[in-house]
Amino acid sequence: MRERASAEEVKTRCEENGLEVPRDLLDADGGTMCASTLDLYIKYSKYSVLAFLMNTFPAVRDRMLADPRFAFKLMVETGADVVMNTATEIKQRGDVFWDEFEFFACDQIAAFAVNTAILTICSPAIVLGNTTRSMRKLGELSKNANGAAKVWYVARKYVGKLPANVFMLDPKLGMMAKLARGGATVIARGGQIFFVSTLCGTVGQATANSLMMLRRAAGRDKYSKGYAESIDVSVDPPVLDTGLLWGRFMMFSANIRQQLVVGGERAVEQFTAGMPSASGRRLANGATVALRVFNNLKGGSDFNDFVIGQAIAEASRRDGGHA
């Protein structure tokens, strides 16, 4: 089998399978694709859920094509989080669970989006073509820019060349170069995770508050009697502060934990590479389940501790201000 499929072959095979050639592939120089990647793209497109993910989220698609197990990892990561969060919320909220259901539902949706984004950010991706239009444009802008704009474009270009996680650093690099690029990778991924987590947390809390106000406007009979009597209409959960709380926690804790999980999976995959395919796949999948379930348990526990710590610190600041 040839290493790369020509642009004409890519177009023909996609049309034969009732698919459109990805827009960014058409924008790439030459429009060629690795033959194995093309086979995987066509295979995934036959499954409606995977086809939806690939067509809707190009970043997820590029990870799925780079790693045949990415979809499984995503399912375990998000599925385990949903199950454990639901169990925890039911236990903690108890009798008021249905009275606060809008907050639970919005938290779940926001958490799903954040978990998907974090795994995507820290996972390797394929580049469908050679040089995409956006990369060419970035190169042109960096050449013509001056001052702060020049620094910004150069920084963007540098970050774009960093690996998805520290375990993908070039082994040929010296120790100091590895430390520098490894540190830059952690910081860059942390910045991306902070932005996404803050956005999801803010939107999720704003949506929950809006649903809460609509529910209250419909009448207190929409709540249990005891809960209705305890409602303070003058107080709403903070929106931006909640988003920033998510962002601060995720950029450090979730960033490091996700990179460690990806590194663990990478080590297991390398270990199973020489094993029979069925046995190796079962071992790799088992390791993914164990690592990602533990990651969710650890993350949930750490987040609760973080929230409590932030609440105590805020109370101390208020007490100090009144002193």
Task: Set out the residue ranges of the language-model regions.
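Glycine-rich, hydrophobic membrane-spanning regions of integral membrane proteins that mediate transport
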Residues: 1-323
